[in-house]
């Protein structure tokens, strides 16, 4: 059985890849980062509340702490999009579009500049988002496949095929 995908690596795809990595192989690190961000926010809130309560004169520090807190909140809420933007800057010319063929022994990804072969043993985790399937190869490398472009079978058949070949469950991510 052979499955085929055509994927454009745009900001939406790269954001999905970042989300897939964050919720699979980076899960523990992501949790620690969010706990740290929460602690920073609590310290900032206490500091701001104390400066307001003491009625001290307006200083740059009084404005910088809330501004830093807003930045932490924004970065926490937009983490995947920010990582997607960084990844978009690092996409090599000619690799913005990829064709992939999944076969019995492995899968092959072709772009306008290269052709790469991968074995299923390299896959650490499989994540399924509403539009994409994400294969995590390491903490910093993933591949996304647009489910709308699937040919050669249904998404259910491909999900079962991947679970069989990798020995890993397909994790559903919203």
Where are the regions that the model predicts?
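Short, surface-exposed beta-strand-loop junctions and turns on beta-sheet-rich folds
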Residues: 115-117, 124-126, 140-143, 151
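Conserved beta-hairpin
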Residues: 75-117
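Phosphoinositide-dependent membrane-docking surfaces
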Residues: 107, 116-133
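Hydrophobic alpha-helical transmembrane segments
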Residues: 55-69
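N-terminal membrane-targeting/pre-transmembrane regions
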Residues: 1-40, 44-47, 52
């Amino acid at each position: 059985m052979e499955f085929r995908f055509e994927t454009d690596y745009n900001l939406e795809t790269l954001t999905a890849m970042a989300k897939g990595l964050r919720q699979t192989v980076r899960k523990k690190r992501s949790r620690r980062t969010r706990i740290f961000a929460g602690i920073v926010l609590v310290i900032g809130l206490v500091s701001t509340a104390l400066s307001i309560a003491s009625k001290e004169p307006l200083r740059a520090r009084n404005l910088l702490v809330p501004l830093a807190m807003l930045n932490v909140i924004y970065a926490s809420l937009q983490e995947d999009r920010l990582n997607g933007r960084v990844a978009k800057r690092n996409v090599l010319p000619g690799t913005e579009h990829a064709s992939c063929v999944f076969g019995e022994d492995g899968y092959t990804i072709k772009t306008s500049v290269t052709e790469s072969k991968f074995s299923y043993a390299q896959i650490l985790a499989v994540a399924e988002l509403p539009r994409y399937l994400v294969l995590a190869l390491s903490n910093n490398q993933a591949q996304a496949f647009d489910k709308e472009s699937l040919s050669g079978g249904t998404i259910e058949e491909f999900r079962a095929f991947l679970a069989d070949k990798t020995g890993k469950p397909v994790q559903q991510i919203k």
